[in-house]
């Protein structure tokens, strides 16, 4: 058993823990450290200047990143078949601008104070979380893949809301360590997906808010096919079971980054009324995603293989 596998098992109950190693100071990691130093410098650059420059850089990178752009084009073509090609390309350009603005702003999220991050954030519908907490209910936040998804999770901690989430450890151990300490800087726990869902649900039952990302494609065996925008998608159906096992309500939330105001926006909807029927539960989840994404499609991670599993076995991304 490798050291990494052993570490995953040992931390199954307490949460994933990445540890610093002196080997991270070897020359092979110097490029990463240089990049980190650059991001930390950007943390103190006024957001309007930083966002203006990085937004333009993101659009330029988006035209160079052929594989990612093609995936986004495919996803938008199926999800919004009524759009013109020009409309889809405009959304993709805006998306890559958001990508760069969020990524080059991560140093700010990693080291600036709670007070600073609170000023840089805005909650829309926070009363839905407050009501559930006041009623003594456990909470699972159903959070679609927006580009500001990591930043919003950290910002929630600044509001006294400890989070627990599942996480795929990064292949590069230094990057993995840096991401983990950033995500956990204000508390909460990350759980390695390799340990399954039980540790995650256990922490939700203990009162930590679950941070659940529902929209990846995990294949036909684990999914049901339900409508998704203008097409269909292999969708995980177990959200209602997760809620029952953790005795929690499921509250949808979508993170956005607004470059005009320089704020991370968290839009929160009322708790979902989930059906025991797997297909109805999965469709309700997709309806929430659609309601979040349709007004601001550039905020969604369209470069994922969202439609990888098709009924006829076709590979849309080949």
From Swiss-Prot:
Listed A to Z, the keywords are: Acyltransferase, Cell inner membrane, Cell membrane, Lipopolysaccharide biosynthesis, Membrane, Transferase, Transmembrane, Transmembrane helix
This protein's GO cellular component annotations are: Gram-negative-bacterium-type cell wall; membrane; plasma membrane
From the Swiss-Prot or TrEMBL record, state where the protein is found. Answer: Cell inner membrane
Q: In which pathway does it act?
A: Glycolipid biosynthesis; KDO(2)-lipid A biosynthesis; KDO(2)-lipid A from CMP-3-deoxy-D-manno-octulosonate and lipid IV(A): step 4/4; Bacterial outer membrane biogenesis; lipopolysaccharide biosynthesis
- What GO biological process terms does the UniProt entry carry, in alphabetical order? glycolipid biosynthetic process; Kdo2-lipid A biosynthetic process; lipopolysaccharide biosynthetic process
EC number(s) given by UniProt:
2.3.1.243
Q: Where is this motif: HXXXXD motif?
A: 145-150
Segments passing through the bilayer: 27-47
Output one GO MF annotation: acyltransferase activity, transferring groups other than amino-acyl groups
Membrane-topology descriptor: Single-pass membrane protein
Query: Per the annotation, which location comes first and is thus the protein's main one?
Result: membrane
Q: Which Pfam families match?
A: Lip_A_acyltrans
- InterPro entries, sorted: LipA_acyltrans (IPR004960), Lipid_A_MsbB (IPR011921)
Q: Which domain of life is it from?
A: Bacteria
**Reactions listed under catalytic activity:** an alpha-Kdo-(2->4)-alpha-Kdo-(2->6)-(acyl)-lipid IVA + a fatty acyl-[ACP] = an alpha-Kdo-(2->4)-alpha-Kdo-(2->6)-lipid A + holo-[ACP]
Q: Per the similarity annotation, which family is this?
A: Belongs to the LpxL/LpxM/LpxP family. LpxM subfamily.
The record, for HAMAP family, names: Lipid_A_LpxM
User: Which function does this protein serve?
Assistant: Catalyzes the transfer of an acyl chain from an acyl-[acyl-carrier-protein] (ACP) to a Kdo(2)-(acyl)-lipid IV(A) to form a Kdo(2)-lipid A.
Q: Kindly provide the name given to this protein in its UniProt entry.
A: Lipid A biosynthesis acyltransferase
Please name the taxonomic classification of the source.
Bacteria, Pseudomonadati, Pseudomonadota, Gammaproteobacteria, Pasteurellales
Quote the gene name from the UniProt entry: lpxM
């Amino acid at each position: 058993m490798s050291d990494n596998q052993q570490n995953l098992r040992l931390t199954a109950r307490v949460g994933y823990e990445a540890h610093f190693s002196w080997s991270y100071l070897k020359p092979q990691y110097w490029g990463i450290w240089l990049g980190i130093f650059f991001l930390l410098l950007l943390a103190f650059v006024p957001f309007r200047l930083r966002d203006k420059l990085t937004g333009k850089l993101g659009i330029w990178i988006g035209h160079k990143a052929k594989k990612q752009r093609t995936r986004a084009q495919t996803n938008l073509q199926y999800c919004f078949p009524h759009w013109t090609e020009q409309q889809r390309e405009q959304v993709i350009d805006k998306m890559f601008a958001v990508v760069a603005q969020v990524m080059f702003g991560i140093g700010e999220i990693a080291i600036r104070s709670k007070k600073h991050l609170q000023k840089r954030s805005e909650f829309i519908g926070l009363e839905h979380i407050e009501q559930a907490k006041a009623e003594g209910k456990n909470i699972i936040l159903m959070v679609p893949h927006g580009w500001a998804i990591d930043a919003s999770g950290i910002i929630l901690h600044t509001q006294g809301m400890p989070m627990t989430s599942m996480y795929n450890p990064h292949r590069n151990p230094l990057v993995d360590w840096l991401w983990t300490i950033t995500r956990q800087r204000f508390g909460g726990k990350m759980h390695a997906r390799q340990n399954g869902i039980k540790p995650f649900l256990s922490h939700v039952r203990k009162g930590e808010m679950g941070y659940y990302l529902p929209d990846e494609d995990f294949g036909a065996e684990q999914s049901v096919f339900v409508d998704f925008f203008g097409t269909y998608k292999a969708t995980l159906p177990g959200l209602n079971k997760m809620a029952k096992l953790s005795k929690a309500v499921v509250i949808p939330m979508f993170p956005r980054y607004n470059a005009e105001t320089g704020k991370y926006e968290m839009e929160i909807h009322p708790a979902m009324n989930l059906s025991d029927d797997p297909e109805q539960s999965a469709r309700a989840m997709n309806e929430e995603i659609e309601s979040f994404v349709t007004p601001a499609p550039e905020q969604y991670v369209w470069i994922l293989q969202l439609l990888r599993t098709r009924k006829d076995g076709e590979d849309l991304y080949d």
